[in-house]
Amino acid sequence: MSERATYAARRVLPDAPLLAAAEGRAPGRRPVWFMRQAGRSLPEYREIRSGIGMLESCFDPALVCEITMQPVRRHGVDAAILFSDIVVPLKAAGIDLDIVAGTGPVVANPVRSIADVAALPRLVPEEVGAVAQAVQLLTAELGSTPLIGFAGAPFTLASYLVEGGPSRNHERTKALMHSDPKTWHALLGTLADTTITFLQAQLRAGVDAIQLFDSWAGALSLAEYREFVLPHSERVFAEVESAKVPRIHFGVGTGELLGAMGEAGADVVGVDWRIPLDVAARRVGPGKALQGNLDPAVLFAGSAAVEKQVRRITAEADAALAAGATGHIFNLGHGVLPDTDPGALTALVELVHSL
């Protein structure tokens, strides 16, 4: 993956608040969007997805476009995020997996040895052509709203492949990491290649920013993260740097890893709800923007409680800016919960924009 990709000219969106905040410029208003904003919280999403499997949906460009647009139309958020799933590039490459309702991704043949790693198929851009087509449809429809592309980080993809599905303790993943570092690094190197190819395909198609989701990194100690994960995430960010778009790095439960995650090369570090943004800024260090960090569960507590927490978070974000953070993008500290009232999200957008 040493050959640098080339990217066609993309949309010029000088006034987009999200891009301004991510790039260290002064936005016209505080930008806000939500992880998992296109999803089960929206009745129009549930209707259009009825009877259609998750992975099938992710490879239908017109459907991806419509689902991605739904929260932009409804909530007035400052960014769209491509409707997809972190295992899409694995499926596209030919790995036998499915997304099982109520469980998540399930892998038919878990990876447990160096031979298993060697047998993994490599992703080529043509295999995610449907995703690229969806990006092109979206950039034609979004107007001045930026489109965020995304991928799963090598560690999180590795956990799914090693465990065979979601895991509470990641015991097989950690066992492989510690008992057979050679196989571990070979696996993450292969998955970094997959992630890079997937992101480059989205960037060539015209996404305006990218986010790397390391959903399970919070299961690691700082020492484990630095030794077994950071070099591979660094390579992902380095390989897409030439696209010159904002790069966001996010993981759940990663308060103790924020400094190292900031070192990986992103322009923006996502923060979950467990740590105040001004504290996060000190851990990340100056020169990075921050994204976050309302607890998704607070949206069930009523408008007064939401407003109280939003005012706290924006004050902490302003303190982070004073301490050297280069921008703030308001978001939740994790994805929108399925039973969230869509009206609460719309009201949250209006509140953030009013402050």
From Swiss-Prot:
<dbReference type="InterPro" id="IPR000257">
    <property type="entry name" value="Uroporphyrinogen_deCOase"/>
</dbReference>
<feature type="binding site">
    <location>
        <position position="160"/>
    </location>
    <ligand>
        <name>substrate</name>
    </ligand>
</feature>
<feature type="binding site">
    <location>
        <position position="85"/>
    </location>
    <ligand>
        <name>substrate</name>
    </ligand>
</feature>
<comment type="function">
    <text>Catalyzes the decarboxylation of four acetate groups of uroporphyrinogen-III to yield coproporphyrinogen-III.</text>
</comment>
<comment type="subunit">
    <text>Homodimer.</text>
</comment>
<dbReference type="GO" id="GO:0005829">
    <property type="term" value="C:cytosol"/>
</dbReference>
<keyword id="KW-0456">Lyase</keyword>
<dbReference type="InterPro" id="IPR006361">
    <property type="entry name" value="Uroporphyrinogen_deCO2ase_HemE"/>
</dbReference>
<comment type="similarity">
    <text>Belongs to the uroporphyrinogen decarboxylase family.</text>
</comment>
<comment type="pathway">
    <text>Porphyrin-containing compound metabolism; protoporphyrin-IX biosynthesis; coproporphyrinogen-III from 5-aminolevulinate: step 4/4.</text>
</comment>
<dbReference type="GO" id="GO:0004853">
    <property type="term" value="F:uroporphyrinogen decarboxylase activity"/>
</dbReference>
<protein>
    <recommendedName>
        <fullName>Uroporphyrinogen decarboxylase</fullName>
        <ecNumber>4.1.1.37</ecNumber>
    </recommendedName>
</protein>
<keyword id="KW-0963">Cytoplasm</keyword>
<feature type="binding site">
    <location>
        <begin position="36"/>
        <end position="40"/>
    </location>
    <ligand>
        <name>substrate</name>
    </ligand>
</feature>
<feature type="binding site">
    <location>
        <position position="215"/>
    </location>
    <ligand>
        <name>substrate</name>
    </ligand>
</feature>
<dbReference type="InterPro" id="IPR038071">
    <property type="entry name" value="UROD/MetE-like_sf"/>
</dbReference>
<dbReference type="Pfam" id="PF01208">
    <property type="entry name" value="URO-D"/>
</dbReference>
<dbReference type="GO" id="GO:0006782">
    <property type="term" value="P:protoporphyrinogen IX biosynthetic process"/>
</dbReference>
<keyword id="KW-0210">Decarboxylase</keyword>
<keyword id="KW-0627">Porphyrin biosynthesis</keyword>
<feature type="binding site">
    <location>
        <position position="334"/>
    </location>
    <ligand>
        <name>substrate</name>
    </ligand>
</feature>
<feature type="site" description="Transition state stabilizer">
    <location>
        <position position="85"/>
    </location>
</feature>
